[in-house]
């Protein structure tokens, strides 16, 4: 006599982790991927600059900060200024 067939579910598939962007769209000139973030974790500062319109923004960071956080701070500062 044979065993009954197992009805156990297969293990869930792992999702691929996609890396976060390092270059962003400029909120001033609207060029795609023209803004680049430079982070200096030893000084706890980050600077984002646009290569096309030469706009820049500098902000303070902590050890958990990522380039997307600097970009979001820049966009938030633009919205509060307007």
UniProtKB/Swiss-Prot annotation:
Keywords: Metal-binding, Nucleus, Transcription, Transcription regulation, Zinc, Zinc-finger. The keyword Nucleus applies. One of its GO terms (molecular function) is zinc ion binding. Zn(2+) binds at residues 26, 29, 50, 53. One of its GO terms (cellular component) is transcription elongation factor complex. Pfam families: Zn_ribbon_Elf1. One of its GO terms (biological process) is transcription elongation by RNA polymerase II. It is found in: Nucleus. The keyword Nucleus applies. Transcription elongation factor implicated in the maintenance of proper chromatin structure in actively transcribed regions. Belongs to the ELOF1 family. This is Transcription elongation factor 1 homolog. It comes from Drosophila melanogaster.
């Amino acid at each position: 006599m044979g065993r009954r067939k197992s009805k156990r579910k297969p293990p869930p598939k792992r999702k691929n982790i996609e890396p976060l962007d390092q270059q962003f769209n400029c909120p001033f000139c609207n060029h795609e991927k023209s803004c680049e973030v430079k982070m200096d974790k030893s000084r706890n500062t980050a600077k984002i600059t646009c290569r096309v319109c030469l706009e820049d923004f500098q902000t303070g960071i902590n050890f958990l900060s990522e380039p997307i956080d600097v970009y979001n701070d820049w966009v938030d500062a633009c919205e509060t200024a307007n």
